[in-house]
Amino acid sequence: MSADPSKDHYSYAAYADPAMARSFDNRRFSGPIGELIAHSQARVLANMVGRIKDRQMLDVGTGTGRAAFSLALGGARVTAVDASEEMLAIARQRAAEQSLTTIKFQRGDAHNLDFADRSFDAVVSLRMLMHTPEWRRCVSELCRVAARLVIVDYPSATSVALFESMARRAMHGAGMKTEPYRVFTRGMIADAFDRNGFRIRSVHRQFVLPIAFHKAIGSRKFTLWSERLLDHAGLLKPFGSPVTLVAERCAS
């Protein structure tokens, strides 16, 4: 993220920190629960994008490149954009280590993407809208450059993420070092896509219990069992988070 809006927004400085870039994947995807989240994210992404071999895909807010790698391994030709050169350096290094030659990494801003309209078959942006200064503007840009599909995720305002979001915002306001984020209702997201000529096609919700709780327990077996139980109890649909969705361009 960068270009013009709110250059002093915390997200620009936070993700430009070399220490953040080096520890990013370890903080989010290490341990049994982190690995479970990573595998689930890759599976959901694959199901939503469908056939991607030789198709042009854009990953916005690629970070260390995890989603871009999944797409490239599926046969897509991927352009991966991030505002943080430090994050991109990690992504480029890992792509080279895996001999992934079908990913083009470049610095760019989600608020002002440097691509022509409908340049990509599908556009993916994970864990980004929650941190952007102007999320509606970002949705407009994602939709503008997508020929057919846009896939995003977000923390739900009807989940326990609401309370963590409130706490982090309060901590940030008090000058404490943290990563505040916003939460979204389904209506907010649906309206933003509708304004740009897209309709939500399908939705996946991941956890009812907080991710931090599952990581503290550290048991894949417990996480799968407890979340399955809560799903059967009817709690996943109203309270599950994060929410990943695929939106499709409406016929002209």
Residue spans of the language-model regions?
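A conserved beta-strand element that flanks and buttresses the S-adenosyl-L-methionine
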Residues: V124
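A C-terminal cap/extension of S-adenosyl-L-methionine-dependent methyltransferases
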Residues: A167-R168, R201-S252
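Conserved class I S-adenosyl-L-methionine
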Residues: S2-I52, D54-G63, L149-G173, W225, L229
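Class I SAM-dependent methyltransferase SAM/SAH-binding core
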Residues: T64-H111
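Acceptor-substrate binding/catalytic loop of class I
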Residues: M171-M188
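A short glycine-rich, Lys/Arg-flanked "PGG" loop and its adjoining helix->strand segment in the class I
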Residues: R136-L149
